[in-house]
Each structure stands twice: as C-alpha cells, then as structure tokens.
C-alpha cells in the first residue's frame, strides 16, 4: 500500500496466482477403510487450495458418519448409485448427480448398488490427501483395521466420528 501527499491511498495489486496444468499421469492409489482412493490433484499441485481424487467404493461400502473440521467436500457420481446422509436425511444420487457436504455437518455416503461406485471428489482447502496417506499406512495388510488407530489418525486430521 502506498500513499501520496494528498492522503490518497493506492492499493498494490495482489501477487499473481500460480496455475498448473497436469498432463495425464497415473494417480497415486491408496486404500482407505475399504475404498480405493486415486489422488489426481493435491495441495502441492494447487497451492493448498483444493484436492481432487476418485473414490471407488464396494457395494454396501462407505465410511462411518463423521464431521470434518477443516474441509468442505464436493462429490460427483460417475458410476453407481450412492446414498448421501447430511442434515439428518438420506438422498440417493446416480451418475451425473452431485452432493456438497460442508465442514461442520455430520455426513456419510454409502454405495447402494450391486457394483462398485465411482465418484470424483474435491475437497477445499487441500490436505485431505494427507489423511488418506496416513490412513493407508494404518490399514496396510490388515483384514480389519484397528479402529482405535483409525480414530486417532482421523482426529489428527480434524475428522470426528458420530453415532
């Protein structure tokens, strides 16, 4: 910010934002509580603004009901039939449909079909990919993950499970 002698204030322009074009690359694939997560964009790609990943969920699968402290989520169903719980109600969404689940609101999703569902998910701000990476380490090689460890990892990333 600068000023001159006539008391007029002049604001300096904001620094230019960086942009990224990501050519086709193989996504990093992680397992998170039975879901396959394919990371496409991370905070490193977007200056921490958002993350983008694909979630593939087995029939009947989905996370426990939970609340995020840090990020909002947008889901776009590519394949399958998915039920979203938010605001105390379930809504069924098919291919081409989307759901917005803001931070601070208890929510979950469940694959309602008899084949794997596929969703493109955005989270903002970025960082949720770090949760998946740590959770994948906890779940690696385990038939059923240690839920105490899952809860601890989740809490470190601002995710809390509710009844």
Please name every model-derived segment.
Residues 45-48, 57-61, 74, 81-82, ...:
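Short, charged/polar surface micro-motifs in flexible loops or helix N-caps
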Residues 1-50, 141-163:
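A short, N-terminal "cap"/entry segment at the start of jelly-roll beta-barrel domains
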Residues 23, 74, 81, 88-106:
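Short acidic-glycine-tyrosine-enriched beta hairpin
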Residues 114-150:
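A contiguous, mid-protein "functional segment" used to position or interact
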Residues 33, 59-61, 82, 100, ...:
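Hydrophobic small-molecule pocket/channel-lining residues, especially in calycin-type beta-barrels
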Residues 36-42, 53-68:
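Conserved short histidine dyad/triad with adjacent acidic residue
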Residues 46, 83, 103-129:
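Ligand-binding loop in jelly-roll beta-barrel domains
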Residues 36, 59, 70, 89, ...:
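A generic "binding-loop/recognition-motif" signal
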